[in-house]
A protein has these predicted regions:
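Cytosolic juxtamembrane N-terminal segment immediately preceding the first transmembrane helix
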Residues: 2-84, 98
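Hydrophobic transmembrane architecture of multi-pass small-molecule transporters
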Residues: 53-54, 235, 444-445, 463-554, ...
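Helix-loop junctions at membrane interfaces in 12-TM secondary transporters
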Residues: 68, 153-164, 221, 415-429, ...
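Transmembrane core module of solute transporters
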Residues: 70-95, 101-113, 265, 292-296, ...
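Residue-level signature of mid-helix packing/kink "hotspots" within the transmembrane helices
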Residues: 87, 114-122, 172, 206-207, ...
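Interfacial helix-cap and linker-helix signal at transmembrane-aqueous boundaries
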Residues: 96-97, 127-128, 160, 212-220, ...
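Helix-loop-helix hairpins in multi-pass membrane proteins, especially solute transporters
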Residues: 121-265
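Hydrophobic transmembrane-helix bundles of small-molecule transporters
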Residues: 220-336
Length: 579
């Protein structure tokens, strides 16, 4: 297998490797940047990002500025709708499942989307290298639009799950392509700010999602959770069709030659591995971990993984997942950290509303509002990091601060009980939001500085893939632990309280707790609180592991030129020789 070279390299981004705007100057006329990665044999390996201060993003006409601005708006809309869709149904899942008479299939409303999203996300980076950024991006938006429309018109759970699956395939392409295209079109010296913008939009939509979802459920209908994405997808599609174009060499390549470049076996087995793994995790709880529903997919996932490793390492000429990327230790560590971040992030977004509704009696809108401190600090961390990075260029330390904040936030949130004040909860969630804001875009910058430019698209898409994969696995694990701990807590209740709660349906649906007599509510609320309390041990463990991983991050320094670094090292060596 080919591993990442340890020699220093400098790769220039040219107009043949970037996208151009319709009716505007080519990208290399708008800016010229260079990304460098160096690895030394010293104890602390330093990777650097070199910025070109002589070239800036300039426009000769107002039309050029307007078209570039529209392109950015389209990218932001695409990211917003994709992220919004991941969480907008979180506070409404119980209500949707109740209305569709499908409480036993409730988790599939989220899982179907995440399984499909993770299946296509690792493919999108390589496909964009073959078929072009625009083709993959537009394809993703069209699928997302179709899935959203099906969901908005759903009258039964099967129709809804089918729509969520189609949405997921589209979302997998959209999410990765936003970061990849921004890297293509943004000047290097502005890249941290552009990626911070995407991280802000992702985090903002993730937190606004539960708020909007709750408001639609409380004051309109849950169908608007999906009609909103139909509208956003249509607008994003129109903008991208007119203002994002491929380089000429991409459009002149025949379709059949592109088809021949696809690693079809790698695509088949990577998709099979992800789908089977997530199915096994989601079927374990309802059918039993020893049942054929669980063991069968686990075995299939294992076989698919072995086949995938063999094909990518020894068979594929143009592998879907190059070993030089996945087996590059500094890159692997970043991916591991993003999995830890995804595992904690999804716990907040999905089980935060459950906690607020079951224990504190909040409605769907209120449970979304309680996530605002998380959102505010996420935005602050992302924007602040993007602006500070040029003055304090050691990216590793931003991520370390974020990881420490994540561990502190979840450690404190674990102490929340039925009597905790809203101020305490808001303060604890603020640390968690800051963690995500400081981590996501800086992790992307780290990986992009380490890998070769030809692997930039696949390396970037894998960052989002591993984060979302962990989120998908996390939902299944959280739900399983939640059900196990809830049964344990219910078993502790006196028989008369248990029977009363059962008669009101409060044991299977926390929305019915407040319909019971007051003397029955308190013990049942305590049972829900204790169960969720135990579930939140998992994000604490993930946050702790994530912090440990950041200690081994390569120190990527933004804006430090390789020549300056070498001169500094040579000067130190000369002093040592003199001594």
């Amino acid at each position: 297998m080919e591993l990442n070279s340890t020699e220093k390299h400098v790769e220039t981004i040219t107009t043949h490797e970037t996208h151009v705007l319709s009716n505007t100057k080519s990208v290399d006329e708008l800016y010229q940047g260079r990304v460098s990665s160096t690895t030394s044999g010293s104890e602390e390996n330093i990777a650097t990002l070199e910025e070109n201060d002589n070239k800036k993003l300039t426009f000769t006409t107002k039309r050029e500025w307007f078209e570039f601005s529209l392109l950015i708006v389209g990218i932001v809309l695409a990211m917003f709708m994709m992220s919004l869709n991941s969480t907008v149904v979180a506070p409404a899942m119980s209500i949707i499942a109740t209305e569709l008479n499908a409480l036993e299939s409730q988790t599939w409303i989220a899982t179907a989307y995440l399984v499909a999203l993770n299946s296509f996300q690792p493919l999108s980076g390589r496909f964009s290298d073959i078929f072009g950024r625009k083709s993959v991006f537009i394809f993703g938006i069209v699928l997302f639009f179709a899935g959203s429309l099906i969901n908005a018109l759903s009258t039964n759970i099967d129709m809804l799950i089918a729509g969520r699956t189609i949405q997921g395939f589209g979302g997998g392409g959209v999410m990765s392509m936003t970061f990849i295209i921004v890297t293509d079109i943004a000047p290097v010296h502005l890249l941290p700010r552009f990626q911070s913008m995407l991280a802000v939009v992702y985090g903002l939509a993730s937190v606004v999602g539960p708020l909007l979802g709750g408001a639609f459920v409380d004051h309109a209908t849950w169908h608007w959770d999906f009609w909103l994405n139909v509208i956003l997808a249509a607008i994003a599609f129109i903008i991208m069709v007119f203002y994002l174009k491929e380089p000429k060499e991409k459009t002149q390549t025949s379709f059949m030659s592109k088809i021949k470049r696809v690693d079809w076996l790698g695509t088949l087995f990577s998709t099979s591995f992800i789908v089977c793994l997530l199915l096994a995790l989601n079927w374990g709880s309802p059918y039993g971990w020893g049942s054929a529903h669980s063991i069968g997919p686990f075995v299939a996932a294992g076989v698919s993984l072995i086949a995938l490793i063999y094909i990518e390492g020894w068979v594929a000429h143009d592998p879907l997942l190059p070993a030089r990327v996945l087996l590059n230790p500094p890159v692997t560590i970043v991916y591991g950290y993003m999995m830890c971040l995804g595992l904690t992030f999804i716990g907040t977004l999905y089980f935060g509303p459950v906690y607020y509704q079951s224990v504190f009696g909040a409605d769907s809108t209120q449970s979304g509002l309680r996530l605002i401190p998380f959102m505010v600090c996420l935005i602050g961390g992302s924007v602040g990091g993007g602006f500070l990075i040029r003055k304090f260029p050691s990216i590793k330390y931003y991520i370390m601060i974020g990881a420490a904040s994540n561990l502190l936030g979840y450690g404190l949130f674990y102490t929340v009980s039925e009597t905790s004040s809203w101020g305490q909860q808001a303060g604890y969630l603020s640390f968690c939001g800051l963690a995500f804001g400081l981590s996501q875009q800086n992790s992307i910058l780290t990986v992009q500085a380490i890998v070769e430019h030809r692997d930039m698209a696949i390396a970037t898409s894998c960052i989002n893939f591993f984060m979302m994969l962990a989120s998908s696995i996390g939902i299944a694990i959280y739900q399983t632990l939640y059900q196990i701990f809830l049964k344990q807590e219910f078993a502790k209740l006196p028989l008369e309280i248990l029977a009363g709660a059962q008669s009101y349906g409060a044991l299977s649906n926390f929305l019915f707790i407040r319909k019971m007599p007051l003397e029955l509510q308190r013990p049942v609320i305590t049972a829900y609180s204790d169960a969720i309390h135990k579930v939140f041990i998992l994000p604490i463990a993930a946050a702790a592991l994530g912090f440990i991983l950041t200690l081994f991050f390569r120190n990527v320094r933004y804006g430090v030129k390789p020549d300056e670094k070498r001169d500094e090292e040579l000067s130190l060596d000369e002093k040592n020789v003199t001594l």
